[in-house]
């Protein structure tokens, strides 16, 4: 399968690429940073993993930067995995509109635009494709300072649910993976005390496995998940 993955250069996105490649897929990775970790994976899977550096905050340029210059119509796109995200940690009384708009551009508007053109590619090639969005447990449980970020993930979940309903008749599926707290670059600013408080809210009292999240994504795009669509799949160590 041909798979487009955003936010591919580190953390969950990189692990998703790794699992996809291990199973023989071809991966088109999009991110802002071309990291050493991604380059190493690219060298290991030469000819199966491709990269393009793109500013995902520029929602209006997505058609040109992704679907004309990278994944053209000659590529039969089977899967789009939306993993890229921007954090915004602050309390509501400090809400800044410019920061909010910048986050929504990356977390909501650009994924919507990529979904639009991914669907057009699938329709052009009569592909029974699959769309998977990576959400956050913060959209389902309250955390101080995450109201704005959580709202963007909630919007994404609603978008996925309705996309699934809209295009299911043509065999196109859309699902969301909802990870719990993971040890990634996005969470690296938290203190050990803050992390421990989060762990205590889970049934397994630990951070969510990045590998487990990646393998759930790959399961959802497989034939084994052919009857799963419009769902939010929690991989959160029993937080919810």
What residue spans do the PLM features occupy?
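Active-site-adjacent segment of SDR/Rossmann-fold oxidoreductases
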Residues: 141, 162-172
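Alpha-helical segment proximal to the catalytic Tyr-Lys
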Residues: 120, 124, 165-169, 226
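Residue(s) in the substrate-gating loop at a strand-loop-helix junction
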Residues: 136
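Conserved mid-core segment of classical short-chain dehydrogenase/reductases
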Residues: 87-101, 120, 145-148, 186-191
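Conserved glycine-rich cofactor-binding loop
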Residues: 9-10
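Catalytic Tyr-X3-Lys loop
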Residues: 86, 93-113, 132, 156
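Active-site helix of classical SDR
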Residues: 115, 152, 160
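C-terminal substrate-recognition "lid" of short-chain dehydrogenase/reductases
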Residues: 206-235
């Amino acid at each position: 399968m041909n798979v487009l993955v955003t936010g591919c250069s580190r953390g969950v996105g990189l692990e998703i690429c790794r699992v996809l490649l291990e199973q023989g897929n071809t991966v088109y990775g999009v991110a802002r940073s071309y990291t050493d970790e991604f380059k190493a994976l690219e060298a290991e899977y030469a000819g199966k993993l491709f990269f393009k550096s793109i500013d995902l905050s520029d929602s209006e340029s997505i058609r040109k930067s992704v679907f004309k210059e990278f994944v053209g119509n000659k590529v039969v796109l089977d899967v789009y995995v939306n993993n890229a995200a921007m954090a915004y940690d602050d309390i509501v009384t400090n809400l800044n509109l410019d920061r909010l708009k910048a986050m929504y551009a990356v977390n909501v508007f650009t994924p919507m635009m990529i979904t639009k053109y991914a669907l057009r590619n699938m329709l052009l090639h009569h592909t029974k494709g699959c769309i998977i969005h990576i959400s956050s447990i913060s959209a389902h449980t309250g955390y101080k300072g995450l109201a704005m970020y959580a709202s963007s993930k909630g919007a994404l979940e609603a978008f996925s649910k309705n996309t699934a309903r809209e295009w299911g008749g043509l065999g196109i599926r859309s699902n969301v993976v909802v990870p719990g707290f993971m040890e990634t670059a996005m969470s690296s600013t938290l203190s050990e005390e803050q992390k421990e408080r989060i762990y205590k809210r889970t049934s397994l009292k630990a951070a969510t496995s990045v590998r487990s999240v990646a393998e759930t994504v790959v399961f959802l795009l497989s034939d084994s998940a052919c009857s799963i669509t419009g769902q939010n799949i929690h991989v959160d160590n029993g937080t919810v």
